[in-house]
Amino acid sequence: MALLFILCRILREVVENHLVILEKKVAGLEEDALGRFVLRARKAVGLRGQVNVLVTNSAAVRSLNYRFRDQNKTTDVLSFPVSSSTSQSRKGEKLAGEVAISADIALKNAYRLGHPAVQEIKILALHGILHLAGFDHERDNGEMARKEAELRRALKLPAALIERVTSRRVSPARRQSPAFPRRKPGAAGARRMA
């Protein structure tokens, strides 16, 4: 039973047995490319089963967070693992779980950190997949952080989510990256989601 996708009106495309829905468009992000990344990340993590990914807006993620976690706030990424005895995907493969990503927060983080939004979506997808595999950064004494850093390097991604949250620093060189324009003086900063 895939409750996460109740919010989705149109199912777009199944890529490599992973359902990717871009409910909110992000420049340069395509469903098939994200589906291929999810497959690579799932294999790198050692997770078996289909992973469905929803890229949506902050309001939808906040609604999911409230409905399933009783947290009435938005966040960047949510993971919904499926127990081994429950759901199967549409192709009959075991469903490992589902990941919901806030495109709004991903865009803010990407801008603040000086890398493309597509990379930020991938970082959040990797973080969600690690949670589906049973990692829990709140209780594992750094195990998830180490694994995420290792996989981030292997998958050629910038600083992993946990590394950013714990360091809370961005080098001046990254802030002035040519990938993103400099902020205008007085521009408001993005909210941090810890």
Language model region names:
Residues 2-121, 130-194:
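An acidic/histidine-cluster motif and surrounding catalytic segment
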